[in-house]
């Protein structure tokens, strides 16, 4: 079941085509990655999903149909531009934001107490928001996003300003939410977090969706562009190899466009190179990201 369906949306601002025929679907109960370089159209796409912007054409189905006022209370949104009130206490700020989502006061206080303890913020609840560190404010912003227990959570750069310990706290929370059926759409530049957490992704560049699918499918699609080899013999220079990168005792050979891994194996064998290891490299998401973005810009 799809909780979010984006069909051929487009949005222009003056001469700039911010979003251009973007399509993807988000399944219920998954963590979905919305990826792309700065200025790719991610934030505009999110604002179209949430009915902040109207698309020039295309359609959006969210929670089973068009956006309504009732559905807004079933969605949690954490924008990259944070929006906490700075001159009131942390507790007062979060309780006020909870009231906007129609959470009864006693229930809001109970949930808030649990989240403040989980995120090591309980001792700071009476401080003004502006007195908190950026990392603390980031955690508080996340609490405000999920306090009403939304069915769909849309978060933009959830790990910004967080140290490794707090990154793990946020990851554990998001994974717990997924385990309980919450759907999460996450936009981030931290590819290693995407690899660890996301079930599927879409990559947007220059307003277009250029990559879409599960991480396993995408890795298989891009395997074959490089091989990992290990040999005690020196590796010869081959015309079919465009780069040789040392990696933990191995060498990753990046292949030219029309070269197949077996071509390299044969070429090395013909030059009497004794191989201890030869396997097709599985690229990281960082490598795929760079390859696709550079390719779509040429």
What are these regions (language model features)?
Residues 1, 85, 103-104, 252, ...:
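A general boundary/transition motif marking the beginning of the first structured unit of a protein
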Residues 224-298:
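Short, charged/small-residue-rich alpha-helical element at the C-terminal edge
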Residues 2-4, 11-205, 211:
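ABC transporter nucleotide-binding domains
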Residues 70, 218, 288, 292:
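Residues that scaffold the ATP/ADP-binding catalytic core of kinase and kinase-like folds
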Residues 171-256:
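ABC transporter nucleotide-binding domain
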Residues 10, 68, 91, 191, ...:
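Alpha-helix N-cap/helix-start and coil->helix boundary motif
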């Amino acid at each position: 079941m799809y909780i979010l369906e984006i069909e051929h949306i487009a949005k222009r601002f003056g001469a700039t085509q911010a979003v251009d025929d973007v399509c993807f679907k988000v399944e219920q109960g998954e963590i979905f990655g919305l990826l792309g370089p700065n200025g790719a159209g991610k934030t505009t796409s999110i604002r179209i999903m949430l009915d902040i912007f109207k698309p020039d054409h295309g359609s959006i189905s969210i929670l089973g149909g068009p956006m309504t006022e009732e559905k807004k209370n079933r969605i949690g949104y954490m924008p990259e531009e944070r929006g906490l009130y700075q001159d009131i206490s942390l507790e007062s700020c979060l309780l006020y934001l909870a009231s906007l989502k129609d959470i009864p006061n006693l229930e809001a206080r109970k949930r808030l107490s649990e989240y403040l303890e989980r995120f090591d913020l309980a001792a700071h609840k009476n401080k003004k928001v502006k007195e908190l560190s950026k990392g603390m404010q980031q955690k508080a912003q996340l609490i405000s996003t999920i306090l009403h227990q939304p069915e769909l959570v849309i978060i933009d750069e959830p790990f910004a300003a967080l140290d490794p310990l707090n990154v793990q706290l946020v990851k554990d929370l998001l994974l717990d939410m997924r385990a309980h059926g919450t759907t999460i759409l996450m936009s981030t530049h931290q590819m290693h977090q995407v690899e660890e957490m996301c079930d599927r992704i879409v990559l947007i560049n220059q307003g277009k969706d250029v990559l879409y699918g599960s991480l396993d499918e995408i890795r298989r699609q891009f395997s074959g562009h490089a091989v990992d080899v290990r040999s005690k013999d020196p590796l010869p220079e081959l015309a079919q190899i465009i780069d040789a990168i040392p990696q933990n005792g191995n060498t990753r050979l990046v292949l030219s466009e029309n070269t197949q891994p077996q071509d390299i194996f044969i070429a090395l064998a013909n030059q009497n190179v004794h191989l201890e290891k030869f396997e097709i490299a599985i690229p990281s998401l960082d490598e795929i990201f760079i390859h696709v973005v550079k390719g779509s810009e040429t």
